[in-house]
């Protein structure tokens, strides 16, 4: 974000709860909030020069996020107010997904959570995707480091191949090997 304190204030205006107040952290200024539906979100403004030389694209970088939420429309409005994101709905046949964009570029999808209390998508939360060059190698390495891979590697037509993982602490992350021209799930 351009201004962590201002984004934090806008989030509070829309019903967010502060987890960590805006704080300097050596690389910039950050805060962590919980949105009105309970999903945690970090806000960060890099210090001048802190990200010089960093290319946030390619192997090992976060390339996409999904927000699982009880109300994608309300969440899109919250993100528009706090982050300035825009959103559009995309018909996926059996369901509709909301695609959020920053600066005209798609950055996240917003999904309606599952209403089954036993389903892991019952809780509102962000689900990050990390780009990898070779998904079989990255998946094997994750397993070696103690990750649980709950299902087989799966294709996402027109996007690439992905592998959901749970690290040894239970944190969910997806590995994504994008197709040549993919820009997000």
Regions from the PLM with identified roles:
Residues 25, 58-61, 121-125, 157:
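Short glycine-enriched loop/turn motifs at secondary-structure junctions
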Residues 1-37, 72-73, 128-172:
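Vicinal oxygen chelate
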Residues 36-47, 86-123, 167-168, 172-179:
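Conserved short beta-strand elements that form part of the metal-binding/catalytic scaffold
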Residues 21, 55-56, 119:
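Short helix-capping and inter-helix turn/linker motifs at the boundaries of alpha-helical repeat units
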Residues 44-77, 82-85, 125-128, 176-185:
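N-terminal beta-strand motif that seeds the catalytic metal site of vicinal oxygen chelate
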Residues 13, 21-28, 32, 67-107, ...:
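Core segments of cupin and vicinal oxygen chelate
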Residues 81, 100-104, 108, 112-114, ...:
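Long, histidine/aromatic-enriched segments associated with O2/redox biology
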